[in-house]
Amino acid sequence: MSTTDTIVAQATPPGRGGVGILRVSGRAASEVAHAVLGKLPKPRYADYLPFKDVDGSTLDQGIALYFPGPNSFTGEDVLELQGHGGPVILDLLLKRILALPGLRIARPGEFSERAFLNDKLDLAQAEAIADLIDASSEQAARSAVNSLQGAFSARIHQLVEALTHLRIYVEAAIDFPDEEIDFLSDGKIEGQLNGVMADLEQVRTEARQGSLLREGMKVVIAGRPNAGKSSLLNALAGREAAIVTDIAGTTRDVLREHIHIDGMPLHIIDTAGLREANDEVERIGIERAWNEIEQADRVLFMVDGTTTDATEPAAIWPEFMARLPATLPITVVRNKADITGETLGLTKVNGHSLIRLSARTGEGIDLLRDHLKQSMGFTSNTEGGFLARRRHLQALETAARHLIQGHEQLVSAYAGELLAEELRLAQQSLSEITGEFSSDDLLGRIFSSFCIGK
């Protein structure tokens, strides 16, 4: 579809509401105003007007706002009609506007896409709009606002600027090899490169925090039947999310709870007890449990402390450990400490974390919460932080890899040309974050995930 068309969409959520907003962007916005309002509102002033149908009858009445480009969200002429939030009224008004020549419905995210294409936002800021709408906690919302205001982009621009200066220095060393000073071996370039690498690592650390705030951690509770898995889910959720009985195999399907630990989203998944099952329904539940386990960020291996004194996972259940992915982090949770009399606490056993607690009484649950937060490297202090997506982390990782390779070329071979190429590739990776270097396919995927009216 053409980006020069005039587009229209509902900017408020579908359904009934006190206010419903239609947004128009493009060259024909002023023509829409004359047709529907009978006049062009004064720019950036709220005008209370009737919204007219083609025969002159009134469809609705409300506030009209006109923002001439380039001083608008999209950088184009923008008209907003704020009327009553009934779906029938909004649909009639939308049909009225679409009947005008040159108007079409906006694609998902097209308003934000036009803001990006018209240099009103960079790509990271545009993504922050969607992240702000989807924020599931106060910290995530504040970090999304920081990203929208350019906090993340500013850090990326600082890195790109530092790489630009470094590339100039390296290119000069390559272009003037006959100078008395050997710029590649005098330590200045290496010092600057080390500084950029350190700054990049700091941004990566902050980005990982931002990614945790946005996406959270998927934690699967797994173990044998009647180990207390559902009781642990209820204790973490702070409510009776799962049915708890003394009957083994009560949980037969996957149960999901979304909670927060000091602002970090946590996706807790309770699964069916793992055993050889003859019942078809239970067997399907166990297969689903294994699917969730294999996709988890961490597994809480639930153990009934009254049935074994073992603390090493392989000794507790070797068949379970043999089936787990080798890189999957595990925390052994010895449950029913209120019965066994074990001392509550967190210890390390052969590289695995082990927590003793009572899911029934809630003793030790706070220790588990702190452990989950610390195991992901999450810190509650996100003042000035920003949200980050997986593509941002991948771009930062790629840039770091190119800088490491460039450093090796510098110190081992004084290979200026190869260093310059690695610096260029690192700069290109960073520019993908803000959209200064992005494929059309990438832009399409990003903006298609937005709301229609954004």
Curated annotation (Swiss-Prot):
Binding positions ((6S)-5-formyl-5,6,7,8-tetrahydrofolate): R23, E80, K120, K454
Cofactor(s) required for function per UniProt: K(+)
Binding site for Mg(2+): S230, T251
Top-level division of the source organism's lineage: Bacteria
Record-linked PROSITE patterns: G_TRME
Keywords recorded for this protein, A-Z: Cytoplasm, GTP-binding, Hydrolase, Magnesium, Metal-binding, Nucleotide-binding, Potassium, tRNA processing
GO terms for cellular component: cytosol
Residues engaged in binding K(+): N226, T245, I247, T250
MF annotations from Gene Ontology: GTP binding; GTPase activity; metal ion binding
Annotated cofactor note: Binds 1 potassium ion per subunit.
A GO biological-process term: tRNA wobble uridine modification
Keyword Glycoprotein applies: no
PANTHER family the UniProt entry points to: TRNA MODIFICATION GTPASE GTPBP3 (PTHR42714), TRNA MODIFICATION GTPASE GTPBP3, MITOCHONDRIAL (PTHR42714:SF2)
Subunit text: Homodimer. Heterotetramer of two MnmE and two MnmG subunits.
Function summary: Exhibits a very high intrinsic GTPase hydrolysis rate. Involved in the addition of a carboxymethylaminomethyl (cmnm) group at the wobble position (U34) of certain tRNAs, forming tRNA-cmnm(5)s(2)U34.
Family: Belongs to the TRAFAC class TrmE-Era-EngA-EngB-Septin-like GTPase superfamily. TrmE GTPase family.
Protein name: tRNA modification GTPase MnmE
Gene that encodes it: mnmE
